């Protein structure tokens, strides 16, 4: 009978006390079959479930990051407003959705404007009323300026639905009333020809911007100078024409305005299309529609002045 206080003999097959080593030690195989043994706690070969740790997950791909120059973009930095960087614009789906949304809004705006111009031009009582009551034009101009400044300068209303749609609708109707009032002062033939010329110019510029490799967005300084020149010329022309009408000066200003806003249309179109030095954030679809629509309407008004057939 063994002493209870003595350590258990090797013959006791207690799992906590392995048996004595065989004579000569353990043999080492030349090649370990099946690779290295599993570390304690990890699943042993042949078992379908882990012993203590979960199975390792498959590797995940990193999300696209907004890298600066020198990180995969050949050192060229694309300036994008807010938090949207080149990574987001590399996604064709995001860009195409943005472009479709912008041009859908522009199409609705142009349809409303053409309808107002048609009413003010072809319906004689309406045409006579707006020619006699110039206050309609000035009220529309005030609404146009206020809504344009809010949409262009205030990010909150521009991005918050439904305020952005409400402001854009007010802006569109104000611009339509202004354009309709101007159109009522010209012959119907001149209005139709100006519409056709504007449509041809706008479509041609859009197709050109889709195809060309010329980056108009890199010439921001040039467009600022053009805008200042057009503004100063407009002020001088208004002062001169207020005292005495000078036909050639009026035509010169109209031609300069048509050329400048055609270039502005190319610039704003490339801002919307993306993949240029400067782009518009995908959240600012209202801004894209606002700019392109304004360019098209101003091209129409300047071309209409060049036609010169007043009532």
UniProtKB/Swiss-Prot annotation:
Membrane-crossing segments per the record: 110-130, 134-154, 165-185, 190-210, 221-241, 246-266, 286-306
Cystine residue pairs: none
Region (Disordered): 1-37, 50-72
Biased composition (Pro residues): 53-62
Cellular component GO terms, alphabetical: endoplasmic reticulum; endosome membrane; extracellular exosome; Golgi apparatus; Golgi membrane; intracellular membrane-bounded organelle; lysosomal membrane; membrane
An individual GO BP term: negative regulation of neuron apoptotic process
GO molecular-function term, one example from the UniProt record: calcium channel activity
The keyword Membrane is annotated on this UniProt entry: yes
Keywords linked to the UniProt accession: Endosome, Lysosome, Membrane, Phosphoprotein, Transmembrane, Transmembrane helix
Residues with the Phosphoserine modification: 81, 83
Subcellular location: Membrane; Lysosome membrane; Endosome membrane
Primary location: membrane
Pfam families: Bax1-I (PF01027)
Membrane topology per record: Multi-pass membrane protein
Matches recorded under InterPro entries: Bax_inhibitor_1-related
Family designation: Belongs to the BI1 family. LFG subfamily.
Function: Negatively regulates aortic matrix metalloproteinase-9 (MMP9) production and may play a protective role in vascular remodeling.
Name this protein carries in UniProt: Protein lifeguard 3
Organism for this UniProt entry: Homo sapiens (Human)
Higher taxonomy: Eukaryota, Metazoa, Chordata, Craniata, Vertebrata
Underlying gene: TMBIM1
């Amino acid at each position: 009978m063994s002493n209870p206080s003595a350590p258990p003999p090797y013959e006791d097959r207690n799992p906590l006390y392995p048996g004595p080593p065989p004579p000569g030690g353990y043999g080492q195989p030349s090649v370990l079959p099946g690779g290295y043994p599993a570390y304690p706690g990890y699943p042993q070969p042949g078992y379908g479930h882990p012993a203590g740790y979960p199975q390792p997950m498959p590797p995940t791909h990193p999300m696209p990051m907004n890298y600066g120059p020198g990180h995969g973009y050949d050192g060229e930095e694309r300036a994008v407003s807010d938090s949207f960087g080149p990574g987001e614009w590399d996604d064709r789906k995001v860009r195409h959705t943005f472009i479709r949304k912008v041009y859908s809004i522009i199409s609705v705006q142009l349809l409303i404007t053409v309808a107002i111009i048609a009413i003010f031009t072809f319906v004689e009582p309406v045409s006579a009323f707006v020619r006699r009551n110039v206050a309609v034009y000035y009220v529309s101009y005030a609404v146009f300026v206020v809504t344009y400044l809010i949409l262009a300068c205030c990010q909150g209303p521009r991005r918050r639905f439904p305020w952005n749609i409400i402001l854009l609708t007010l802006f569109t109707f104000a611009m339509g009333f202004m354009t309709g009032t101007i159109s009522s002062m010209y012959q119907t033939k001149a209005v139709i020809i100006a519409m056709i010329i504007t449509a041809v110019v706008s479509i041609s510029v859009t197709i050109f911007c889709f195809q060309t490799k010329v980056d108009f967005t890199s010439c921001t300084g040039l467009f600022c100078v053009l805008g200042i020149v057009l503004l100063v010329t407009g002020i001088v022309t208004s002062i001169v024409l207020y005292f005495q009408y000078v036909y050639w000066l009026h035509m010169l200003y109209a031609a300069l305005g048509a050329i400048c806003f055609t270039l502005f249309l190319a610039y704003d179109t490339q801002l919307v299309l993306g993949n240029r030095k400067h782009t518009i954030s995908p959240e600012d679809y209202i801004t894209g529609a606002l700019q392109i629509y304004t360019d098209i309407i101003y091209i129409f008004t300047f071309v209409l002045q060049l036609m010169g057939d007043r009532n």
